[in-house]
Amino acid sequence: AVRLLQQHGENARLIAGGTHLLVLMKMEREAPRALISVNKIPGLDVITVHADGSLIIGSRVSIRDLGRHPLVRSRYTGLAQACESFGSTQIEIMGTVGGNVCNGSPAADLVPMLLVFNAEVLLKGPPGERSVPLEQFLVRPGVTAIRPDEVMVGVSLPPVAVGSSATAPDT
């Protein structure tokens, strides 16, 4: 995917669920010359739990799978609640963590709780991998710190202390 992004430059867009990008294309607000699917990249659809309780959430993990993960439900309760607040079952199934974070929307359902849990965005590009705190990744509405030749591979969440919790406000 990184090689294809370098090859096609600003004319390419990454796609997984497509719930945001396809709407923009239909409205003719986006017209990429190349769509690069990340659906076959191994590991992007996995939630990894480390021994210390920290999580790596692959960028292609669906909103539904994230919200149903046992550790997310028990320790990152507010994040599980945010997953349940999505507008439709179709969006929960098709929408991805990467899409929700990378579109930079101020209305992104996951971002507030990811900020509460001190998330870092994991990126991979030609120089290698880098980790960017989510609050620095979100530059302004619709703009993120991802470089044109980078792929978001996941989100890292530090462990949550036993007995602590954060919940999403009712919407």
Describe these PLM feature segments.
Residues 2-171:
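C-terminal structural segment of proteins
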